[in-house]
Swiss-Prot record:
Organism classification: Bacteria, Pseudomonadati, Planctomycetota, Planctomycetia, Pirellulales
Domain SSB: 4-107
Keywords, ordered alphabetically: DNA-binding
Biased segments, Gly residues type: 107-122
Basic and acidic residues compositional bias, start-end: 82-92
Protein name: Single-stranded DNA-binding protein
Amino acid sequence: MASFNRVMLMGNLTRDIELRYLPSGMAVAEFSIAVNEKRKASDGQWVEDVSFFEITLFGRTAEVASEYLSKGSPIFVEGRLKQDTWEKDGQKRSKVKVIGERMQMIGGRGESGGGGGGGGGRPAASRPNSGGAPAESQRSNYVNSNTPSSHDSQPTGDGPGYDEPDIPF
């Protein structure tokens, strides 16, 4: 049976991004986001639930996020879940985190809640490319990570049976 591991989250950074480099030279950015959800409680009152998620980005995506985002910045992240397990004081522990494969900065300049360098909401897709060929991030609204993917291709939505007016949202 096939499996599917995909997550999409939109929230705000709860702390500044920690950027480090692996011995191979690949950038790794680690941060967490808060995702707010409003729902109606059984008594009819609206309540807000907050969930916190640890996010890890790799490669150029990590560098862009570190350069333009800071605590409070809104962000959209798409990726996959990964469970880390370890042992501490003889007890097995585990934590589920998100390996971000794509991210998008939300909002414009000055709307990001303190985006670093004044470009907190500036989409990476509009950044100039220093090389001759278009960068991957310039071909879409997302900044793509250099992480290996569990699948080689994604559905494009152009195949048979795709009818845009039938989308329920």
